[in-house]
Amino acid sequence: MAKLYFNYSTMNAGKSTVLLQASHNYRERGMQTYLMTAAIDGRAGTGRIASRIGIGAEADIFTPRDDVFAMIRDRLGAGPVACVFVDEAQFLSPEQVWQLARVVDDLDVPVLAYGLRVDFQGKLFPGSATLLALADEMREVRTICKCGRKATMVIRQDASGRAITEGAQVQIGGNETYVSLCRKHWREATGDPGAKGH
């Protein structure tokens, strides 16, 4: 029985590396996979999933307007797919997450989604919130803070390395823009949002 999986973490934990390795494992055994990634994230080039350690693969892109169920159903028309992999899943709309659930439930194809859990303000992305609600299984891909603790948060920083606490939820960037931290160091860097107004 197929399942919807959500593999989540903060920035620079190796989500894309894990996705690419899992897809490779299927393909090595003669099974086809279908890779998708968000059109908004062009850091590796449009329609490409790449990891910081240098591996990559071509992928179909989705925009917020796309019907991902239809995209996957159409791909299945070209031949069997053992598993669907979705990178940058935080950029899925809630409706698209429901469409992925339909792929699992109606087409009996496993879907493994990989994405960020929270943004730089500590808020859930809408796609991630819906994945947390609907996924059959969730797995945390771990990375570490500068202090050695598990990093669960991310800060956005300016060119001088100062934390930015306001702005649009989505701003594409890499190591120069975002830093993964434990909650304690995130609170210190952002001015402890929980203490505001007290």
Curated annotation (Swiss-Prot):
Zn(2+) binds at C145, C147, C182, H185. The active site is at E88 (proton acceptor). Transmembrane segments: none annotated. InterPro entries: P-loop_NTPase, Thymidine_kinase, Thymidine_kinase_CS. It holds the Pfam family TK. It catalyses: thymidine + ATP = dTMP + ADP + H(+). Signal peptide: none annotated. It is found in: Cytoplasm. ATP binds at S9, T10, M11, N12, A13, G14, K15, S16, D87, E88, A89, Q90. This is Thymidine kinase. The lineage of its organism: Bacteria, Pseudomonadati, Pseudomonadota, Alphaproteobacteria, Rhodobacterales.
